[in-house]
């Protein structure tokens, strides 16, 4: 059983909450949500980010970088998982005896009275959460990415029902109070949090599912296919007549689901149809079928997921994929998109590995995942995400792709410049380029750094 956090948030209208690491997508979502609930929010981070700018525009006082002077009369401190005990603001809060909560513990208070549609899995959870949010427009939403439908990762609502993207990386999904547990897959990742113990990892998913009133699962997953308790089940054979089209220049997937008829969803690929199907099945008890079918059309994608930045002489796509399974699936979508556009351009991949631990844990899979639909591979330095640097010979491991190694990429007008030692070594003026990574590659591709 989970231990209930000793500190609970209540009377939000009178509550002063300080977030350490407020620029992160998960923490910024909670900050926006609690501000809308009436709490007084402040925060800090190590650098300016789009989330920090957004919150500042809402009137949130944010210190860059962390500053112990920012800790004074707050009622509670909430910090992201990456913040360590020796953080100056954490130390100051302890001196002042201000209660300190991790994001994981804070979730219990925030969600305990909500009817939560909690989406968790290794891949696809942001898309499913955003799709379900589009299908159920009266529900609140907290997503780990920006929905293009409402241009935010948070949608406030007076409705008790909330669509929530849960996180397995720190086991915080176990604190999400799921009314409905929606799980597309359980591919092992973040095993360092689970002591590299697969039994412990899968037990967490089982606990998550067991404690929901409603369960929606994709039974092609090796773990989920053996889940024995009552659940709404999706299988690969339930999705058929998949077709890909351009509608007003935008990519869409058309498919039929079980005996429910045809659906149309933004995006490309079988995985896109699977994600949409799980969202649809999750909403069948909430809305009439035709409402679900029509509302799904409001989904316009999410930022950094097959995010088409431009489509002229240079087609440029930014994608968050940072795991081999995700990269392989998205490359298939890229090839489909190229075919729909009738372009003969080769697909150029710019890849920024995210975390040394993930790269090392999945190295053999990474070495294979570019083998299809990637005509040229360009490799950026590993984005460490605060991990200690490890020695790894990427040139040796990826030599079979004859890759180009660069220090960074820079957007210059409609072109991309490849740089080594701050010198431009190549300019890409036309073609089909897709960038992969969960680090700062997204800002490089957008010309924001």
Swiss-Prot record:
| UniProt pathway annotation | Cell wall biogenesis; peptidoglycan biosynthesis
Q: Give the main location.
A: cytoplasm
Keyword Transmembrane on entry: no
Q: Which reaction does it catalyse?
A: UDP-N-acetyl-alpha-D-muramate + L-alanine + ATP = UDP-N-acetyl-alpha-D-muramoyl-L-alanine + ADP + phosphate + H(+)
| Enzyme Commission number(s) of this protein | 6.3.2.8
- Keywords assigned by UniProt? ATP-binding, Cell cycle, Cell division, Cell shape, Cell wall biogenesis/degradation, Cytoplasm, Ligase, Nucleotide-binding, Peptidoglycan synthesis
Report the enzyme's class at the first EC level. Answer: ligase
Q: Which SUPFAM superfamilies match?
A: MurCD N-terminal domain, MurD-like peptide ligases, catalytic domain, MurD-like peptide ligases, peptide-binding domain
Query: What GO molecular function annotation could you give as one example from this UniProt entry?
Result: ATP binding
Kindly list the places in or outside the cell where this protein is found, as annotated in its UniProt entry: Cytoplasm
Family annotation (InterPro entries):
Mur-like_cat_sf, Mur_ligase_C, Mur_ligase_C_dom_sf, Mur_ligase_cen, Mur_ligase_N, MurCDEF_pg_biosynth, UDP-N-AcMur_Ala_ligase_MurC
Name the residues that bind ATP: 121-127
> What's any GO biological process attached to this entry?
cell wall organization
* Domain of life per record: Bacteria
Gene Ontology CC annotations of this record? cytoplasm
Keyword presence, Cell wall biogenesis/degradation: yes
Looking up Pfam families in the UniProt record yields: Mur_ligase (PF01225), Mur_ligase_C (PF02875), Mur_ligase_M (PF08245)
The protein's matches in PANTHER family, at most eight in alphabetical order, are given as: UDP-N-ACETYLMURAMATE--L-ALANINE LIGASE, UDP-N-ACETYLMURAMATE--L-ALANINE LIGASE-RELATED
This molecule's function is given as: Cell wall formation.
| Family the entry assigns | Belongs to the MurCDEF family.
Protein name, please?
UDP-N-acetylmuramate--L-alanine ligase
Species this chain originates from: Helicobacter pylori (strain ATCC 700392 / 26695) (Campylobacter pylori)
Taxonomic lineage? Bacteria, Pseudomonadati, Campylobacterota, Epsilonproteobacteria, Campylobacterales
């Amino acid at each position: 059983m989970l231990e209930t956090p000793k500190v609970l948030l209540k009377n939000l209208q009178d509550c002063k909450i300080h977030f350490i690491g407020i620029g992160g997508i998960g923490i910024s979502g909670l900050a926006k949500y609690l501000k809308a609930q009436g709490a007084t929010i402040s925060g800090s981070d190590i650098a300016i980010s789009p989330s920090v700018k957004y919150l500042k525009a809402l009137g949130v006082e944010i210190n860059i970088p962390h500053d112990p002077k920012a800790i004074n009369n707050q009622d509670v401190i909430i910090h992201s998982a990456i913040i360590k005990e020796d953080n100056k603001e954490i130390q100051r809060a302890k001196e002042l005896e201000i209660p300190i909560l991790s994001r994981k513990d804070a979730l219990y208070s925030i969600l305990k009275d909500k009817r939560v549609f909690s989406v968790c899995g290794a891949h696809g959870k942001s898309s499913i959460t955003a799709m379900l949010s589009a299908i159920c427009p009266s529900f609140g939403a907290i997503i780990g990415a920006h929905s293009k439908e409402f241009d935010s990762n948070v949608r406030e609502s007076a409705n008790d029902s909330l669509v929530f993207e849960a996180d397995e990386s720190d086991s915080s999904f176990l604190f999400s109070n799921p009314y409905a547990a929606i799980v597309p897959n359980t591919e092992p990742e973040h095993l360092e949090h689970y002591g590299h113990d697969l039994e412990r990892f899968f037990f967490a998913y089982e606990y998550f599912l067991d404690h929901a009133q409603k369960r929606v699962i994709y039974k092609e997953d090796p773990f989920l296919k053996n889940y024995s308790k009552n659940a709404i089940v999706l299988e690969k054979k339930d999705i058929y007549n998949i077709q890909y089209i351009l509608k007003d220049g935008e990519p869409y997937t058309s498919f039929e689901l079980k005996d429910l008829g045809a659906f149309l969803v933004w995006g490309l690929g079988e995985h896109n149809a699977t994600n949409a199907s799980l969202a649809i099945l999750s909403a069948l008890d909430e809305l009439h079928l035709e409402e679900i079918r029509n509302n799904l059309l409001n989904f316009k994608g999410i930022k950094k997921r097959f995010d088409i930045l431009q489509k002229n002489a240079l087609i440029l796509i930014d994608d968050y994929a940072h795991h081999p399974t995700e990269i392989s699936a998205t490359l298939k979508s890229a090839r489909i998109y190229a075919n729909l556009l009738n372009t003969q351009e080769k697909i150029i991949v710019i890849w920024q590995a995210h975390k040394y631990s993930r790269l090392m844990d999945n190295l053999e899979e990474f070495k294979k995942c570019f083998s299809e639909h990637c005509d040229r591979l360009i490799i950026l330095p590993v984005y460490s995400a605060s991990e200690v640097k490890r020695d790894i010979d990427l040139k040796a491991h990826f030599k079979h792709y004859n890759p180009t190694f660069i220090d960074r990429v820079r957007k210059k007008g409609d072109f991309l410049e490849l740089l080594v030692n701050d010198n431009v070594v190549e300019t890409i003026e036309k073609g089909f380029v897709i960038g992969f990574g969960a680090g700062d590659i997204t800002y490089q591709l957008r010309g924001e750094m």
